[in-house]
Amino acid sequence: MIDRVSFIEMSARQRAQFLLDKGTYRELLGPFDSIMSPWLLDQNVVPQADDGMVVARGTINGKNSVVIAIEGAFQGGSMGEVSGAKMAAALELAAEDCRAGKPVQVVLCLETGGVRLQEANLGLAAIADIHAAIMDVRRYVPVIGIVAGTVGCFGGMSIAAGLCSYLIVTREARLGLNGPQVIEQEAGVQEYDSKNKPFIWQMTGGEIRSRIGLADYFSKDDAEEIKKAVSNFIDKGNPKEFRTDRYEEYLERVSNFDTSKQADTRVILSLFKQ
């Protein structure tokens, strides 16, 4: 019998409520405000009242905090104009508070396939705003990302995950710039079989991402363990060096890779050996 609470099985709203101190949860632009995407109905897609994005203010260990959680169950957590604007604006407001001497801790729950195809360039523009806002606010407080599963984090939002000060992943998580189906479509099934689940998790799963240094904490699907990791990273403050500061090192490693050979877990581990 499992004696722990699953973080993966929580909705975005439940995740935000769980991470914030009890009784402090206050949602901004929630479902009753009906800030919905204006583009989906015309494409025969039923919109959601919060556009799949939960922004909640409260405290974590008594410190003012904002938790921004993507609902992976709505359109695969895809980022549209409204949902992207909600996240970007929340990050920008947190940065403004920090500059005013009122630091706000930032936690991102990332379950997303990337840009929402029905909104195309509007979603891409929103993701660019999110990247800029993360870079801004992380100068003052750590930005803590969580990729728990089962959607994973792909596309432009995987870059957002890489910009976070700290990243928490589970075994069920996946993290990659392109999703399995996209790679298979472009490179062929012999290069990347999207139906081969063990292979997919060996290449992009939370465990391998943690082992090669692209994530900072590898957790069980245990809500309390994840909450404790968030608390510890908040207390720790920003790292001395962000992953993005090491971009030249990563580029050199990738440029020296022989792309004529099929990559596997062993190759990835040797390529990104710490």
Per-region residue spans from a language model:
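Amphipathic alpha-helical segments at domain termini/boundaries
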Residues: 1-28, 34, 184-274
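Short Pro/Gly-enriched beta-strand edge/turn motifs at strand-loop
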Residues: 32-43
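A short, well-ordered alpha-helical element
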Residues: 51, 80-102
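STAS-typified acidic loop motif
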Residues: 60-85
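A glycine-rich phosphate/pyrophosphate-binding beta-strand-loop-alpha-helix module
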Residues: 97-121
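Conserved catalytic cores of soluble enzyme domains
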Residues: 113-242
